[in-house]
Amino acid sequence: MTFDGAIGIDLGTTYSCVGVWQNDRVEIIANDQGNRTTPSYVAFTDSERLIGDAAKNQVAMNPHNTVFDAKRLIGRKFNDLVVQSDMKHWPFKVTTKGDDKPVISVQYRGEEKTFTPEKISSMVLLKMKETAEAYLGKQVKKAVVTVPAYFNDSQRQATKDAGTISGLEVLRIINEPTAAAIAYGLDKGDDGKERNVLIFDLGGGTFDVTLLTIDGGIFEVKATNGDTHLGGEDFDNRLVTFFTEEFKRKNKGKNLASSHRSLRRLRTACERAKRTLSSATQATIEIDALFDNVDFQATINRARFEELCGDLFRSTIQPVERVLQDAKMDKRSVHDVVLVGGSTRIPKVQSLVSDFFGGKELNKSINPDEAVAYGAAVQAFILTGGKSKQTEGLLLLDVTPLTLGIETAGGVMTALIKRNTTIPTKKSQIFSTYADNQPGVHIQVFEGERAMTKDCHLLGTFDLSGIPPAPRGVPQIEVTFDLDANGILNVSAEEKGTGKRNQITITNDKGRLSKDEIERMVNDAMKYEADDKAQADRVEAKNGLENYAYSMKNTLGDSNVSGKLDDTDKSTLNKEIEAALEWLSSNQEATKEEYEHKQKELENVCNPIMTKMYQSMGGGAGGMAGMPDMSSMSGARPAGGASSGPKVEEVD
């Protein structure tokens, strides 16, 4: 059965969250571990693929094959300075196949596999989709997915591709701070007054500032700014560097940076210390046998942490100044400053923002981890025709974060759509040829705020040919930019004299996936899903055999039962059970069918003996005390008896 609505997904750098409109309100959905946010981690092992909590929990044991931060790669080029800098902090391998698109290399089931950032992100989206399906009890086909407001065209398009690969129809890509503003607006209710609201959204990997006016149900974005590469991960990096040096100083120059496992354990401890410092003034890190069998203990206070990250914290104020400037608004006119994103819990960040607004009390009424998914779920409800008094008349007027234009003579950036223009929008402009009898024009589309295109970001190029011979400046070429509600651009050019026309959806060939690649990845995703299902079935069959064998063993250990069995039967049962457990121990990677066959073999020996004993006691069909029901042995194994099955690892 298919869910006729749509879900809202906040696809985060470090954590993701999913919500749905149910019972006239948004429900934020907990995952299979009971957590309302899911780590944006994907891990590959010799036998399976893990996503979310399961992936993050084993990262110290398997650092090279556990992928995170895909959002910091998506829509970027391999040679991007930001990517090159991040690679120093990642234990997994990022390479390129020569087309400047980054790919991630991992070992999966004994083979080397490469995945694009879109593919990894699609796996996280799939996990969120499955989380929603488990809650709704229906298949989910549609979603609204959020992106940082300052994401460029190729990053937005790549995120949309990730949704397609995961099997979702992405109804809309919306900006994270705008989604959070919806959550704030619904939470506050309509008091009939127009309010100027600044959303300060500092998450795990990205930072956005959006200034908007809320009047009744109309949310009108005035300006947006930010940094697509600033967040909690960067604060963690500073702590990791600090403690790596501390370890070196305390241990005669031992460099733990040479061990990915040690670095990962340290990073986990640093993330925990960072969180502690939001509520306490001091945090202690204790890690046994961190590197070269040396234990590590160190303390850091809040003041030192603030000093280590001071420049990063201070850099969050500049985008705030810029949005006020772009919106031509005085900071005293801002009614509410709303904090969103986990990193806004840091006291220093809060005090910097409050001081900038003259000591203003900051609004912390919405959950900083869930607000974005909440807003996305509201938008998903509206886009699928949902009706509710709360969402009646709700209208989102968002803006494009960056100026869009084309290159004209001399490498000049000629703007067609200025930054902070409300979307959707369409703008046209007439251009002409640069030389006499020019047969065609090469149109290059750029995004950015600089005067020259060499300092802006190239989105894509196309040609318009077949222009009749004419002196320079005579042909009239109309270039039209059509920016949709997702912030994705379509460009067309038409020669007015002949009506010759050409157009492209900006696909940024250098950073974007082709239709064929997306289709191939959709098919791959189905295959991986089938693999995951097969692995789950295999584990269930293995557990079924293990549970049955141990339950029989426990039953034989019960004096009520063993006293009523003759020695031959008892010996047969013991021998068969021990043989089955020994087989299990040596065949951890057997197939589902082999486990089921082994269980059937064991049942064929055990059941007749137990039935015979039971009948000799005159028992009916109802079972007896001390003898378990063997009809559905696939749950958790009863206590008693060691096992070579799954072990619980302590997470560093």
Curated annotation (Swiss-Prot):
Which segments cross the bilayer? none
Tell me the superkingdom of the source: Eukaryota
Q: Which GO terms describe its molecular function?
A: ATP binding; ATP-dependent protein folding chaperone
Which InterPro entries is this protein grouped with? Answer: ATPase_NBD, Heat_shock_70_CS, HSP70_C_sf, HSP70_peptide-bd_sf, Hsp_70_fam
Q: Which CDD domains does the UniProt entry name for this protein?
A: ASKHA_NBD_HSP70_HSPA1 (cd10233)
Biased composition regions of type Low complexity, renumbered to the chain: 626-646
* SUPFAM superfamilies, A to Z: Actin-like ATPase domain, Heat shock protein 70kD (HSP70), C-terminal subdomain, Heat shock protein 70kD (HSP70), peptide-binding domain
Q: Which keywords does this chain's UniProt record carry?
A: ATP-binding, Nucleotide-binding, Stress response
Stretches for region Disordered: 619-652
Q: What NCBIfam families does UniProt report for this protein, alphabetically?
A: PRK00290.1
User: What family does the entry list?
Assistant: Belongs to the heat shock protein 70 family.
The protein depicted here goes by the name Heat shock 70 kDa protein
